[in-house]
From Swiss-Prot:
Organism listed in the record: Glycine max (Soybean)
Segments crossing the lipid bilayer: none
InterPro entries: Cupin_1 (IPR006045), RmlC-like_jellyroll (IPR014710), RmlC_Cupin_sf (IPR011051), Seed_Storage-Functional (IPR050253)
Tissue and organ expression note: Associated with the plasma membrane of several cell types engaged in sucrose transport, including the mesophyll cells of young sink leaves, the companion cells of mature phloem and the cells of developing cotyledons.
Taxonomy, superkingdom: Eukaryota
Protein name per Swiss-Prot or TrEMBL: Sucrose-binding protein
Ranges annotated as biased composition (Basic and acidic residues): 73-102
Keywords: Membrane, Signal, Sugar transport, Transport
Membrane disposition: Peripheral membrane protein
Principal location: membrane
GO cellular component: endoplasmic reticulum; membrane; protein storage vacuole
Length: 524
């Protein structure tokens, strides 16, 4: 009898072993209640049906069934966890692949085309307003400037841009044309004339209208919006108070009872007032109306307290850097501690590079440059570490990143962004000067570091460190970076009667190859 029991137990344990081996290949099933597992029910039933088993044998058998069931559940959970992790990993790989494909389709995440990346918000016979897409829609690399939006206003001759206010701080730059800005304070309207090169800051919520006072030419205004809403970064809206059917007045959202009570005017008169305008938000006006909207005298005060008058002309300011090959004018937060530039931590710059000339290769320490080409053609190159992973399919065993060249031809209406620390260079074409205005964000304490010209960062490096960094004699390195042509710059500067101030004269120079390399491609 003992031999039969042992034999039966051996057979049963062989049956359990077979079940264990099937776990790895069986399909995982969710069980809410332990007794509902058919394998567990079958196992326990067979234990009870073995007549040759003693009560002790049956207990051992039932315990083996329970132990097998627990092991099965643990194994199923493990398989489920492994399956979940595998799916998550596959999903991450797909997302990374899609992101990489998206970036490969757009090899210039810092370049914005006029015909591709601007959307038209307003368009009438009198003009249009185009807004550049959010910077983060182009690339996640631009999250730091997500809350800045660039817009371009184009208005035909003798047009009126209806009164509105924005839920954003706005910096206006007059690219071309002659304008009148009407700024509404609590008690009156302050009228300010804008000439080409004028820049002005409009505080958020300030009602304003714009007039193109020129009889023949279009007006082009660049507008940098800095939305003040913390809940929707990078999103700004315009609100029309005066209006009718087109543009629709913001007051139309209120009930007639509320409007009648607030304005103490019957509904009929209110309907007459808010039902007349249907010409759109930009429309032509007569010469007499333009004359009536012009300032009667030159303003000497600013109706909004708390800051100095926020208007200046960057074209007329003395250049920060200038020679026969280019001119850079900067107005920044360090120029006036009480200015709106200080509060917005913003620098405004104007660059004019002479044809067949270039800026030095340089980078900003703190500022992110948002540049708009306003005239001329040229070329841009940026050194970018973020793009290097997709520029090469092979991984190099190195202790430093690789760098990818982002390059683009430049023409009027294009926008490009240069993050801090990224070396870049701009080059004017052979036939015309390259003119750009730049909004430099986070500009406080910003410094420019150059790689070419007098006093560049390599030439300023001490010789021992220079030799260690290049693993090359410092005399040979100095022969490359201590260019002798900056001496020619001094001579040319004297011929042009230009002041010589260290790096300033060597910030711009002609775009020409060394004599031994002339005739080869510059971008080789």
């Amino acid at each position: 009898m003992g031999m039969r029991t042992k034999l039966s137990l051996a057979i049963f344990f062989f049956f359990l072993l077979a079940l264990f081996s099937n776990l790895a290949f069986g399909k995982c099933k969710e069980t809410e209640v332990e007794e509902e597992d058919p394998e567990l029910v079958t196992c326990k039933h067979q234990c009870q049906q073995q007549q040759q088993y003693t009560e002790g044998d049956k207990r051992v058998c039932l315990q083996s069934c329970d132990r097998y069931h627990r092991m099965k559940q643990e194994r199923e959970k493990q398989i489920q966890e492994e399956t979940r992790e595998k799916k998550e990993e596959e999903s991450r790989e797909r997302e990374e692949e899609q992101q990489e494909q998206h970036e490969e389709q757009d090899e210039n995440p810092y370049i914005f085309e006029e015909d591709k990346d601007f959307e038209t918000r307003v368009e009438t016979e009198g003009g249009r307003i185009r807004v550049l897409k959010k910077f983060t829609e182009k690339s996640k690399l631009l999250q730091g400037i997500e809350n800045f939006r660039l817009a371009i206003l184009e208005a035909r001759a003798h047009t009126f841009v209806s009164p509105r206010h924005f839920d954003s701080e706005v910096v206006f730059f007059n690219i071309k044309g002659r304008a009148v800005l009407g700024l509404v304070s609590e008690s009156e309207t302050e009228k300010i004339t804008l000439e080409p090169g004028d820049m002005i800051h409009i505080p958020a919520g300030t009602p304003l209208y714009i007039v193109n006072r020129d009889e023949n030419d279009k007006l082009f205004l660049a507008m940098l919006h800095i939305p003040v809403s913390v809940s929707t970064p990078g999103k700004f809206e315009e609100f029309f108070a005066p209006g009718g059917r087109d543009p629709e007045s913001v007051l139309s959202a209120f009930s007639w009872n509320v409007l009648q009570a607030a304005l103490q005017t019957p509904k009929g008169k209110l309907e007459n007032v808010f039902d007349q305008q249907n010409e759109g938000s930009i429309f032509r006006i007569s010469r007499e109306q333009v004359r009536a909207l012009a300032p009667t005298k030159k303003s000497s005060w600013w109706p909004f307290g708390g800051e100095s008058k926020p208007q200046f002309n960057i074209f007329s300011k003395r250049p920060t850097i200038s020679n026969g090959y280019g001119r850079l004018t900067e107005v920044g937060p360090d120029d006036d501690e009480k200015s709106w530039l200080q509060r917005l931590n913003l620098m405004l710059t104007f660059t004019n590079i002479t044809q067949r000339s270039m800026s030095t290769i340089h980078y900003n320490s703190h500022a992110t440059k948002i540049a708009l080409v306003i005239d001329g053609r040229g070329h841009l190159q940026i050194s970018c570490p973020h793009m290097s992973s997709r520029s090469s399919h092979s991984k190099h065993d190195k202790s430093s990143p690789s760098y990818h060249r982002i390059s683009s031809d430049l023409k009027p209406g294009m926008v490009f962004v240069v993050p801090p620390g990224h070396p870049f260079v701009t080059i004017a074409s052979n036939k015309e000067n390259l003119l750009m205005i730049c909004f430099e964000v986070n500009a406080r304490d910003n410094k420019k570091f150059t790689f070419a010209g007098k006093d560049n960062i390599v030439s300023s490096l001490d010789n021992v460190a220079k030799e260690l960094a290049f693993n090359y004699p410092s005399e040979m390195v100095n022969g490359v970076f201590l260019l002798q042509r900056f001496l020619e710059r001094k001579l040319i500067g004297r011929l042009y009667h230009l002041p010589h101030k260290d790096r300033k004269e060597s910030f711009f120079f002609p775009f020409e190859l060394p004599r031994e390399e002339r005739g080869r491609r510059a971008d080789a």
